[in-house]
Amino acid sequence: MDWDHNVTFSAVRSLQATTAVAQATDNVVDLDRNRVDSRPGVLPTKNESSPHSSASLPPPSPHPPPPPAFTPSPSPSPSPSPQTATARSSVTDAAPAPKRSPRSPLHSNGSFPPVSDPISSIDSRDALDIDHESTAMLASSSSARKSKPKLQPQLINHLPLAQQAAMATFHEITFNDYHDKKLGRPPGKFDDYMICDCTPNSGNLDMACTDYSGCINRMTQIECSASKCRWGKQCRNQRFHRRQYVDVDIVQTEKKGFGLRACQDIPKETFIYEYVGEVMNQTTFLQRMQQYRIEGIRHFYFMMLQPNEYLDATKKGGKGRFINHSCNPNCAVSKWQVGKHLRMGIFAKRNIQKGEELTFNYNVDRYGNDAQECFCGEPNCVGTLGGKTQTDLSGMDDLFLDALGISDEVEQTEAKGSRRKRGKRLDLDFIPQMRAIQEHEATRVMTAARQAGPKREILEKLLRRMEMTTDVNVQKSLVKLHGFILMQFLLEQWWNDRDIVILIINVLARWPLIARNKVIDCGVEDQVRILAQTYRPRSPEDQKPSLDALRQVKQDDSAADRNDYTQVQPTLAPVRIGAPPAPDAEVSARAEHLLEAWKKLDMTYRIARKDALKPDADDHKDATAVTTWIDRRRMQDLDDPLDLEHAQAPNAVSSELGNALSGDQELREIKPSWQPPPAPPSMPNAPAKRMGGAVHHRSPPGSFTPTRLQSSGQSPLTPDQVTSVLSSSLVKSLSGLVSSLKQQGIQLQQQQQQQPPAQQQPSAQPAAPSAKSIEDIIREANEQEERARKEAEAAAKAARELEVNGGQTSGSSRKRPSSASRHSDKRAKHSSLSSSSQAASKLISSNGSAADSTSKAGSVESVAANERRLRKLVGELVVRQMSKYKDDLERESFKRHAKELTNAIVGKEMRNPKSWPPARGALTELSLDKRAKIKAFAKEYIDKLLARKGKGKGSSTPSNNEGAGSSNNGIV
């Protein structure tokens, strides 16, 4: 259409059209009302009751600050309508040049040309563009509502300072005031195990436990230890400890009381201030709520620290108490693990400009009386603060939304709501779809799980995501981010919640492990064992042992060293709040399967090196070193001390779990420190089948050959074979002496069992039973035993002489296990001789005696297995107890005394007729009473050892003799 460009529109017509567009925009988009209210000539609507109408911006001026997308005109504006439309525009690609023909007045430079020259400034085409833009704005109201503009920060530079008046309203404290020393400490072993992997191998301080270094402590909101971090004083993850606060001003607001204003530009993730106050339990918290309601205190100063523990900064606190609420906050509150306590810090959620008011969302963290009207003045204001539930998306922290993987969905569906629209609630009118964790989400998920606290709905979904994750790399990341310590914490907190417990067990069953040390050190194995006992169906008279187990695990380590452990009160009793759960066979069975899978892992004390885990690395167990968790973290020669490439994971808590790991267990048992004799031929031809029919090449020429007895279906081992294997094994290791002699007794008794059927065979092979007489067999066996005994005594004597000459500190204390070994040798020798003499008489007896011999052989074999199990259980307790004194002992001394103490305790236990052999046959676990007594005995031993060490090197030898003698007191 050919329009007449010479038609001139008056400036009044242009102004009216522009005003119509602005009014249409007002009815569609309700953004940034604070700036609108602060400008002259604009009346607020009935919904615009912003408390920051004058507190959010400087006083009105002829040149109000426009959005940063364009440059304001130097000439004053005759009308505020174009500027109002400009401030409320959702389009930011405007051009500052006045000569450019704008798409709409919303994109203009904020000023109009003089009315005296309307022809040169605006023509008919421009007016038509205005009409078209007005129609487009009205037609696209829904799209304008969904387009989220970038909200401009609220500056409060004009507000007056109120430092003195504000500080007079409360008592300022530097650190939290704990009503009880047990408060503020999360359950779990968070003392010596929260060490990061950062390596100070460069001079770049930006890598000193910062966001750029990938510090696992910083990523999981744990502050590094000032004394144990490898970066030392250069560590930048000690902000709470060093009180590295940002400079802030306390100002007087119009409707919100006092507030905080930034005195400098604050980058994102910066630590601003710690929120300190009185830490109290839930009972005191409820009393304080009632008291403050009576006193008329309506401001919110309560924060939940952890379940049943609250932080009150009403009358005691710091400057952080003055931070106000906002529905569009620039700060966030996070709970950090600092030493043994949980502490709350205020962090920058985004980049903050100088002069902004510092705010965070009270609906997320704070607790107060009834819901109150919100005065934040933000466009996305929900109208009230307080009165929100844990499932309200409007009050949910962005950390949880990101960890659940629903941030984008919540933003797109406007699930948080606004002042005119109610927000949605999780699992009620907003049901998210959970998915497996991606590798880049691992940090957020683990941090959110630590912060979940009483938010059960959120925690359950996070655990569900962990359970769904099958990616091995993601599972390794979860383990590295203190995963096992987190699970131990959650099991203590949610021990009576059946669904949460099942999820945690399923997650643990999928996490990879190199050795069993980690689950023992962090205490998660004890928690799973308690769950197995708690949920196991039992009769009413069996309830007391389960309660004793709960008290035993919860008691303090120092109190556990005493014998009378039943009188010790639990140190973390408030955690066990709630009724015990109902017995559940499924939970108990899954916990038992998980424990059995963990038991199949080795208990090692060395770093998992790649070269040490190769198949050709022979005798790698001989080179193991007893180290602690911190020692493994401090190893300078390893880039990755937590290498999980060769880790094993229980992939399912079921019967297939044990079958999958049994093969690995057999492979680990192939290379012991000493070679035991071959298994007794209880199953005919079993060795030949396993070895492909090959003949054992260790047999001497004059002994029976297995192939000569294959026709009778038997292949028994002769005493020559037994003693030959015994002597060869004794040369390799002295520690196998006692067990080898017992195995020899088993072989001799088995010989007696197998020989009578061989004599009753037809005369087709008469040479087999008559190759040697019974007297020759006994004589040769005795000669071999005597030679083996002399070789063992010579080796023991040489070892003792080497110990005496090697150092005075361990000379006398190491004689005691050797003496016990000699007594065991004598007893084993007498028993073997008696067995040999009895074999001659029983060979001519009836076949009924063979059945008795079979039962005796089985009992001897079970005793040997029980001894190995006892040594393993005692060794674990000894190493764990001695690790408390790791700083006072050198590594070699630690190893030596740990072995001595283990041998001493095992010897005492086996010499006690009341407890050995076990009454129920196979030994599975030590009783709680036995574990407590072993700990007490170990503590007494270590105390005497450290006392002798403190007297000086000159008096170490006589002190050792005295300590060795005194430590012979029985533990049972």
Swiss-Prot record:
Residues 246-363 form the SET domain. Its EC number is 2.1.1.359. Residues 83-92, 702-721, 847-857 have a biased composition (Polar residues). The keyword Methyltransferase applies. Residues 25-122, 670-721, 748-772, 784-864, 948-972 are annotated as: Disordered. The keyword Transferase applies. This is Histone-lysine N-methyltransferase, H3 lysine-36 specific. It comes from Mycosarcoma maydis.
